[in-house]
From Swiss-Prot:
Keyword match Transcription: yes
Feature: compositional bias, Basic residues: 169-179
Gene Ontology cellular component annotations, sorted alphabetically: nucleus
Region described as Leucine-zipper: spans on this chain: 274-281
Biased composition (Low complexity): 51-71, 95-134, 180-196
Protein name: Probable basic-leucine zipper transcription factor E
Matching Pfam families: bZIP_1
Top-level taxonomy: Eukaryota, Amoebozoa, Evosea, Eumycetozoa, Dictyostelia
Record family assignment: Belongs to the bZIP family.
Coiled-coil residue windows: 8-47, 324-362
Region feature (Basic motif): 248-268
C-alpha cells in the first residue's frame, strides 16, 4: 500500500508538472506573437553584420526539464519502437524487391512492343517503296497549256487558265404554230412588222451563238487531238486503249491537275519574289529617309555657321575701316550678334548639364530602389527563419507533452487495484 501511495503521489506530481509546462508554453507563444506584431509594426532594417537569431533561454530550460522527466519513461517505448521499425524495414525490403521485379518485366514488355512496331514500320516502308517503283509513268501537261502559262507568267498576270468550256446544250427549235394559234393572232400591220423584226433579231443572235460555239468546239478538238498525239508519242497507250474515251479522259484530267498545280506553284513563287522585292525596297527607302534627315540636319548646321561667319566678317571689315567710317549702328549690330552667339552657347551648355544631372538622378534612384528591395528580401528571409524556429520549438514542446501524457496514462492503467 505504501508503494502504491508513493506511485500515486508521483503521478500527481507529474500531472502538476505537465500543467505548469503547458501554462509556460502558452505564455511563451503569447510572447512570441507579441514580438512578431512588434516587428511588423516597427519595420526595422536588419543587416547581416548586426543580425543575431534570438535564443529563448526559457524554452531551453523547459526543454531540458522535459527531457529529464521523459528519459525515465521513454525506455520501454524506445524498445518497442525499435522492434516495430525492424519489422517495417523487413516489409519494405520485400515490397521493394517485388516492385523492382514488376518494373523489369514491364520494361521488357515495352521493349518487345517497340521492336514489333519498328518491324511493322519497316515492312510498311518496303511496301510503299515497292508501290512507288511499280507506279505508272508521270504525266506531263500539254505544250499549248505550257506556252499559255509561260506567256502569262512573263507578263506577270496572276490569272488561272480557264477550264475547257463544256459543250453547250443546243436549244430545241421552237414548235411550229398551229393553224388555230395563227388564226387567233391579230392581223394588224403594226403587229406584223414587230413580229418580223423580233424574229430577225433572234435569228441573228442564234447565228452568232452558233458561230462562237463552233469556234470553241474547234479549239477544244484541236487541243484534244494535240494532247492525244502527245500521249501516243510518249507511249501512254500501253494497254491499247487509245480509241477508247474513258482512259483518255482520265489522262487528260490528270494532266490538267498537274498543270494547275505547277501553275499555282509558279504563282506562289512570283508572289514571294514580289514580296521580297517590296521588303528590299522598303529597307532601301528607310535608309534613304534616314540619310535625308541626316543631310537636312547638316545643312541647317552649315546655314547657321554661314550666318555667324557673315556677322564675323562684317565685324572684321568694320574693325579694319577707319573710325570715321564706322558708325555706332554697325557697332551695336555686331555686339548684338556676339551676345546672341554667347547666349546660344550658354543655353546649349545648360541643356547638356541638365540632361547629365537627370541621368545621374535616375541612376541614383534605381540604385536606391535595388538596395531597398535587397533589404526587404533580407528582412523577409530573417522573419521566415524566426517563424520556422518558433514553430519547431512549439512542435517539440507539443510532442514532449503528448509523450508525457501518454506515459502517465500508461502508468495509471498499469497500477494494481487497491
Amino acid at each position: 500500500m505504501d508503494d502504491q501511495q508513493l506511485t500515486i503521489q508521483q503521478i500527481q506530481q507529474l500531472h502538476m508538472l505537465l500543467q505548469q509546462q503547458q501554462q509556460q508554453q502558452q505564455q511563451q507563444q503569447q510572447q512570441q506573437q507579441q514580438q512578431q506584431q512588434q516587428l511588423q509594426q516597427q519595420n526595422f532594417q536588419l543587416t547581416p553584420q548586426n543580425f543575431q537569431i534570438p535564443v529563448n533561454n526559457n524554452n531551453n530550460n523547459n526543454n531540458n526539464s522535459n527531457n529529464n522527466n521523459n528519459n525515465e519513461t521513454a525506455f520501454n517505448i524506445t524498445s518497442q519502437n525499435n522492434s516495430i521499425a525492424a519489422n517495417l524495414n523487413n516489409d519494405t525490403n520485400i515490397i521493394n524487391t517485388t516492385t523492382t521485379t514488376t518494373n523489369n518485366n514491364n520494361n521488357n514488355n515495352n521493349n518487345n512492343n517497340n521492336n514489333n512496331n519498328n518491324n511493322n514500320n519497316n515492312n510498311n516502308n518496303n511496301n510503299n517503296n515497292n508501290n512507288n517503283n511499280t507506279a505508272p509513268n508521270q504525266k506531263f501537261p500539254t505544250r499549248k497549256y505550257k506556252k499559255q502559262k509561260d506567256k502569262l507568267a512573263e507578263l506577270g498576270i496572276d490569272v488561272e487558265l480557264s477550264k475547257k468550256p463544256t459543250a453547250a446544250v443546243k436549244k430545241k427549235p421552237p414548235a411550229k404554230k398551229s393553224a388555230k394559234n395563227a388564226a387567233s393572232q391579230p392581223t394588224s400591220p403594226t403587229l406584223s412588222t414587230t413580229n418580223t423584226s423580233s424574229a430577225f433579231t433572234t435569228a441573228v443572235l442564234d447565228t452568232k451563238k452558233r458561230k462562237n460555239q463552233e469556234l470553241l468546239d474547234y479549239s477544244d478538238n484541236s487541243e484534244e487531238s494535240d494532247s492525244d498525239e502527245e500521249d501516243f508519242e510518249n507511249g501512254d497507250n500501253e494497254n491499247g486503249d487509245f480509241p477508247g474515251g474513258g482512259d483518255r479522259k482520265n489522262r487528260r484530267l490528270l494532266k490538267n491537275r498537274e498543270a494547275a498545280q505547277l501553275f499555282r506553284q509558279r504563282q506562289k513563287e512570283y508572289i514571294n519574289s514580289l514580296e521580297s522585292k517590296a521588303s528590299s525596297l522598303e529597307a532601301s527607302n528607310t535608309t534613304a529617309l534616314s540619310k535625308v534627315s541626316h543631310l537636312t540636319e547638316e545643312n541647317q548646321l552649315m546655314k547657321d555657321k554661314v550666318r555667324y561667319l557673315k556677322n564675323f566678317v562684317k565685324q572684321a571689315v568694320s574693325i579694319s575701316l577707319p573710325m570715321s567710317v564706322v558708325n555706332q549702328d554697325n557697332i551695336n549690330n555686331l555686339n548684338n550678334n556676339l551676345n546672341g552667339l554667347q547666349n546660344q552657347q550658354n543655353n546649349n551648355n545648360n541643356n547638356n548639364n541638365n540632361n547629365n544631372n537627370n541621368n545621374n538622378n535616375n541612376n541614383n534612384n534605381n540604385n536606391n530602389n535595388n538596395n531597398n528591395n535587397n533589404q526587404n528580401n533580407f528582412n523577409n528571409n530573417n522573419n521566415n527563419n524566426i517563424n520556422n524556429n518558433i514553430t519547431f520549438n512549439n512542435n517539440n514542446n507539443n510532442n514532449s507533452n503528448n509523450n508525457n501524457s501518454n506515459n502517465i496514462d500508461s502508468l495509471l492503467f498499469n497500477l494494481p487495484p487497491d
